[in-house]
Regions:
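Catalytic-core domains of enzymes
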Residues: 54-61, 73-76, 114, 122-223, ...
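Domain-scale, conserved, charged regions that form catalytic cores
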Residues: 1-145, 157, 166
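Short, charged, surface-exposed loops that flank catalytic or proteolytic processing sites
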Residues: 115-117, 320-330
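Functional beta-strand-loop-alpha-helix junction segments that form "active/interaction loops"
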Residues: 2-13, 93-94, 179-262
Length: 330
C-alpha cells in the first residue's frame, strides 16, 4: 500500500481526534539520512525528525549523529533495562538522557506548544527497537508524558478510525516444548484472559499452525493473543518461527492474513512470548512487525525477557481497560 501524503495524514488525525479515538494526536517520523561528505571519527548521518499534526504546519528538525555511537547508547540502555538496573536519569551522560536529547528534545517544545498528547512514531530501520518509554529529559520519562504507538511504516498501518466491531478474542499459547524451556504460567495467563474477556482458548495441543491461521482469518474475531516462544533467525520471516503446541510454524505464513482479512483487518495482535518485538537487522520489529505486515491495525510485543506473573497480570488489566474505552496507546 502507498504511504499517505501529509495532507492525508492531517485529515486522518483530525478524524481521529474528532471521534475521540485519541487525544491531541500527531505523527512523528524519525529516520536516518546518510551524510554525503564524511569525516573519519565524526558524525556520519543525520537524524531527521518530522512532526505532523492535524492543524499546525509540518515541523522538521535535523540532528547530526554518529551511527556507531547511537547503536552503542541503545545497547547500553537495553542492558540496563534487561538487568533491571537504575537508569540514572539524573546524569545527562546516561543512555536514557542522551537518546532523549537526540530523538525527543529537538521537538519537545513544539509538542508542548501544540498540546500533543498522543503520538504515532514512524521509525526508520535502526530506530524501530528504541524503548521510547524509557527515554528521559531528567525530570520525567517519555512514556509518562505521552501515549504512543510505533510503526515501521505508515503504509503498513491502517490509520483511518475503525468502525465499531465485535471484540471477540482468541487466546492461544503453549506451555511445554521439545528442546525449549517451558512456560509454566501460560495456562494461567490464557485462562485469566478467557475469564475476563470471554476469549476462545486454544492451549498446547489445541494450538496448532492450522488453528491459528484459520481462526485468525475468521472475521468474527478482532483480537488475537498468543503466548509462546518465538525464534528470529537471519533470512527474514521465512526462516523465523513461532512455536505452537504441535511444533514450529514459519512466520511468513502469518503474512497471508492481510489478504484474508482485507475487508476487516484484525484490530489487535498480542504476542507475549519472549522478546517478540525484536527481530534481526532486516526486521527490527520482529513478530510484532510481521503482525502489522499481516494487516493488523495494532500489535504488541515485548522488548526483552519478561516475568510470566507480571505478563499475566498486565494483560488481564490491559484488556479490561481496553474494553472500558481506553485507547491502546494509553
Amino acid at each position: 500500500p502507498p504511504t499517505p501524503t501529509v495532507e492525508e495524514l492531517q485529515t486522518l488525525l483530525e478524524q481521529v481526534e474528532t471521534r475521540r479515538f485519541a487525544s491531541s494526536p500527531a505523527v512523528l517520523q524519525v529516520r536516518f539520512t546518510e551524510m554525503r561528505q564524511l569525516q573519519p571519527g565524526f558524525h556520519d548521518a543525520f537524524l531527521d525528525l518530522t512532526l505532523i499534526s492535524a492543524q499546525s504546519p509540518v515541523q522538521a528538525k535535523r540532528v547530526e549523529v554518529n551511527r556507531n555511537s547511537f547503536a552503542a547508547l541503545l545497547k547500553a540502555l537495553y542492558r540496563q533495562l534487561s538487568r533491571q538496573e537504575a537508569l540514572a536519569v539524573h546524569d545527562p551522560a546516561s543512555p536514557a538522557r542522551q537518546l532523549h536529547a537526540l530523538l525527543i528534545a529537538p521537538v519537545q517544545e513544539i509538542l508542548q506548544e501544540q498540546g500533543i498528547e498522543t503520538l504515532l512514531i514512524a521509525a526508520d530501520q535502526g530506530l524501530q527497537a528504541v524503548p521510547f518509554a524509557a527515554l528521559s529529559d531528567g525530570t520525567d520519562y517519555f512514556g509518562n508524558r505521552y501515549a504512543f504507538a510505533l510503526t515501521p511504516s505508515l503504509a503498513l498501518t491502517p490509520l483511518a478510525p475503525a468502525e465499531s466491531r465485535s471484540q471477540n478474542q482468541l487466546a492461544m499459547g503453549a506451555s511445554t516444548f521439545d528442546g525449549l524451556a517451558p512456560l509454566p504460567l501460560v495456562p494461567q495467563e490464557l485462562e485469566r484472559i478467557e475469564s475476563s474477556s470471554a476469549a476462545d482458548l486454544y492451549l498446547n495441543q489445541a494450538f496448532t499452525p492450522t488453528v491459528l491461521l484459520e481462526r485468525a482469518a475468521d472475521q468474527r474475531y478482532s483480537r488475537v493473543h498468543v503466548a509462546t516462544h518465538a525464534d528470529f533467525r537471519p533470512g527474514g520471516p521465512a526462516e523465523s518461527v513461532l512455536h505452537t503446541g504441535t511444533g514450529p510454524m514459519s512466520m511468513a505464513q502469518f503474512a497471508d492474513l492481510r489478504r484474508q482479512r482485507r475487508d476487516q483487518p484484525l484490530d489487535l495482535v498480542v504476542l507475549s512470548a519472549c522478546r517478540t518485538l525484536l527481530g534481526d537487522a532486516d526486521s527490527e520489529l520482529g513478530f510484532a512487525g510481521l503482525a502489522l505486515q499481516a494487516g493488523a491495525r495494532s500489535a504488541i510485543g515485548t522488548l526483552w525477557y519478561v516475568d510470566d506473573v507480571v505478563t499475566s497480570a498486565f494483560f488481564v488489566q490491559f484488556y479490561r481497560l481496553l474494553d472500558q474505552g481506553l485507547s491502546k496507546a494509553q
